[in-house]
Amino acid sequence: MMLMMLPFIGSVSVSESLVAMTTVCLVYLILKFFQTEIPEGLRRLPGPKPLPIIGNVLEMGSRPYLSLTAMSKRYGNVFQIQIGMRPVVVLSGSETVRQALIKQGDDFAGRPDLYSFRFINEGKSLAFSTDKAGIWRARRKLAYSALRSFATLEGTTPEYSCVLEEHVCKEGEYLIKQLNTAMTADGSFDPFRHIVVSVANVICGMCFGRRYDHDDQELVGLVTLSDEFGRVVGSGNPADFIPILQYLPSATMKNFLRINGRFTEFVQKIVTEHYTTFDKDNIRDITDSLIDHCEDRKLDENSNVQMSDEKIVGIVNDLFGAGFDTVSTALSWSVMYLVAHPEIQERLYQEIEDKVGLDRMPLLSDKPNLPFLEAFILEILRHSSFLPFTIPHCTTKDTSLNGYFIPKDTCVFINQWQINHDPEMWKDPSSFNPDRFLSADGSEVNKLDGEKVMAFGMGKRRCIGEVIARNEVYLFLAILIQKLHFLPIPGEKLDMTPEYGLTMKHKRCHLKATMRARNEH
């Protein structure tokens, strides 16, 4: 989302040409900016003064969510920065963001036409697409309907209420065995390494109806690709913000295209197989559900927007990538917080022992009876804020917010980290305290406080897989806490410093775990 550095240009003549051309572009943009008429009664956006060509990149540093939070204290909840040659409006504060994304949702529902966005899922991405409103809404409705249909699919045996529950319970049980094996062989384990593969398997099961061995090269390759995608997108593509760089060779862009090509090739192969074996009376997974809804749309003469089969590949690709990365990151952070706060880990175990027992696995139906676990997950999402920004938004027309004029096609950043750490909303926001979400007697979660946490976006672009993701995180965690006691390695300090990216990961480390004895309490 930001420029980390400008690419090195070796030839002096090329450098001089680049400077000259970018200077011309810069002068043009500056003149255009100052020629923009501000409607009567509205104000020009405040913000730091940009440097020529690179804008405010240097002020953003390696942790832009912190830098932009600091700027919001100086300039307010609506201000403008410049990244390269592109003006960007930054929104902070829960009420301001709610006003923009919900009350003025249509005005801020676009996606900026960033150069790199054109190549994500070959331009067919639901999350990153700059499609016109009607087309985008039709695709979103299709994806949402498919997810809703999938959520009602029953498990293969009566003990599971749905397919999601079956996938997570089976994979959770296998994950515990894998961690025990690692403990026996090595005395410790890398939590992210094992969690990420287990979550990928659940996503593969839900999207594609298949499960892999943890050392399967295709699965390991997908995990690696997803990690690379997060790093590349998180570090930013200079061509998104300095347009002339689109025409110059770029190692970053070459790698970006390679990653997207591999993902698309993998999903295209599976979608093709699903078309070959599709049976409308036997919906097996999300891909089948998408095909089913897509076929219904083709038969609907009243449908204004027909959906091409290629769009299914883009939607499946989005659901796989987003669901896999978000859930695995949430779970790995959760384990880190369990180790960092042993007293909280014991309270969670006690709650599960009291409300679920130790003779069966926790299920989705147990969720209302485990308020402290729900509060713990909410505090993970708030305190870590591992999704510091939403995917950038874009204004669809000239608009205003908090009295400031914002032109059409302006790129907009939503600072979720600031909202989740705003001292005006949260008492002692830097402290990790799940109890902040509980009622006075601890018997239930305060829903209004829980809704203040921003992790999945808001409004028309809110993540459509949020409910599935939350249920998956809950169920995985309940299973792990019921069976395992997570511990640090003696003498090693736990480093909770996030590493910036599209999703912020904790630094890779090793932990220990022991099986819970049934008579432990």
Swiss-Prot record:
GO CC, one annotated term: endoplasmic reticulum membrane
Record gene name: cyp1a1
Family: Belongs to the cytochrome P450 family.
Residues given in the record as heme binding sites: 463
Entry keyword annotation includes ATP-binding: no
EC class of the enzyme, as a word: oxidoreductase
Official protein name in the record: Cytochrome P450 1A1
Pfam families: p450
Function of the molecule: Cytochromes P450 are a group of heme-thiolate monooxygenases. They oxidize a variety of structurally unrelated compounds, including steroids, fatty acids, and xenobiotics.
Organism of origin: Limanda limanda
Residue sites binding substrate per the record: 229
Cofactor: heme
EC numbers, comma separated: 1.14.14.1
CDD domains: CYP1A
Reactions catalysed, as given in the entry: an organic molecule + reduced [NADPH--hemoprotein reductase] + O2 = an alcohol + oxidized [NADPH--hemoprotein reductase] + H2O + H(+)
